[in-house]
Amino acid sequence: MSKLFVFDLDGVLIDSLPNMEHAWTSVRVKHEINVPFEDYKAQIGKPFPDIMRELGLYDRHLEIYETYKTHSRRCLDQIPLYDGVYDTLTELKNQGHKIALCTSKNRETVSLLEHKLPEFDYISCPKQGLRGKPAPDQLLFVMAFCNVDPIDTVYVGDMEFDQQAALRAGVHFEYAEWGFGDLVCDHSLKSITNLI
């Protein structure tokens, strides 16, 4: 039976942590912010405005985002895929499964990274009318678009917010052990290749 495999992007498919740290360092310098990267990292998985709210920087989130985006995009081509990602996603599609992306990255940035990955059946980025993770909205929208029920859906993520979104959407969650988070889960993957 075919399934829908939904993937988070950062920390699951791409190793973007060095890029994020570089961009956050630029933000700290330009905007004279004393929030360490570890505090930012703990919020990864949420939409950027929500991260800024958690860090007490929401009143400046638009200007901070512009700095972050500019410095992050300068190095996008240097962000590698994790080992086995391309082949695993391709094999899942070859087996007749659907694959989708559910990320907190904006669509414009994702479009600059898409060429590194196989074609997805759907890509969900934050959009008006849908709450970001840990709310289930994006996952529910992906399933509706792909015509797949929660029981036939697997969400692979690396952060607590991914796990919460999966639980709230009623889908099976697989924790990506190689990612940015530090979770204790009943179901985890040592490598993305464990999916095939």
What are these regions (language model features)?
Residues S2-Y86, Q95:
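N-terminal helical cap/lid subdomain that shapes the substrate entry/recognition surface
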Residues T25, P49, L89, L140, ...:
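Short glycine-/small-residue-rich flexible loop motifs, especially phosphate/cofactor-binding loops
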Residues M1-K3, K93, N106-I196:
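Asp-based, Mg2+/Mn2+-dependent phosphohydrolase catalytic module
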Residues V12, T103-K105:
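Conserved phosphate-coupling serine/threonine residues in phosphotransfer and NTP-handling enzymes
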Residues N34, K98, H172:
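Residue-level detector of anion-binding/catalytic polar loops
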Residues L9, Q43, K98, Y155, ...:
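Short glycine/serine/threonine-biased micro-segments
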Residues R74-L101, S111-E114, P136:
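Short, acidic loop-to-helix structural element flanking the phosphoryl-transfer center
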